[in-house]
């Protein structure tokens, strides 16, 4: 699991990318998908993409910071679900990274820190496709370990999105329920005022602790 194998942090050199990094972005996204969608060139112009070459000549990871007032698919989906309806803030797009890239948690934490420099934490969101596979569960765990709180599951085209918030006070009292990522009850529990900041593992995979928000 990534949480257990995150080691080679001495090769962590994340930085904001510039237009000259576009060819490297194209190479990474050819296999992983474009972090910011069709507006990647514009995002590079505005220093809105965090990237890491990890001490190599090849871009190993990238993540875009999209404006909530924009027309990206992520921003539209979140606003339609009632998140950031005023158009303020940032939504962090799903990261693109190579299979060999290890410091995922550190990369996510740095992206969160950069977003907080640009706007208040209660205006920062992150979205990630709900993927009930071992890799998808590991990435969800990385988000939670990086300081994000799972707030909702919303539709986007034919898939579902996990919506994380950068600042959500979660009650530390009794757990409402422990569920797996693929449990159909998860969206309903979150809709009823639950949030997830803690997690664990069992034989079936990732276990999310749903608690009431304070």
Description of each model-found segment:
Residues 1-53, 59, 174-177:
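Short amphipathic alpha-helix that is part of the acyltransferase structural core
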Residues 45-70, 192-198, 211:
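Conserved beta-hairpin
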Residues 58-99:
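Conserved acyl-donor/pantetheine-binding loop and adjacent beta-alpha core of acyl/acetyltransferases
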Residues 70, 127-129, 144-162, 195-205:
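Conserved catalytic-core motifs of GNAT/GCN5-like acyltransferases
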Residues 88-90, 115-134:
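Conserved GNAT acetyl-CoA-binding A-motif
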Residues 89, 93-117, 138:
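Conserved acetyl-CoA-binding loop-helix of GNAT-fold acetyltransferases
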Residues 97, 124-139, 179-181:
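Conserved beta-strand-loop-alpha-helix junction that forms the acyl-donor binding cleft
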Residues 156-178, 205-214:
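C-terminal "cap" of GNAT-fold acetyltransferases
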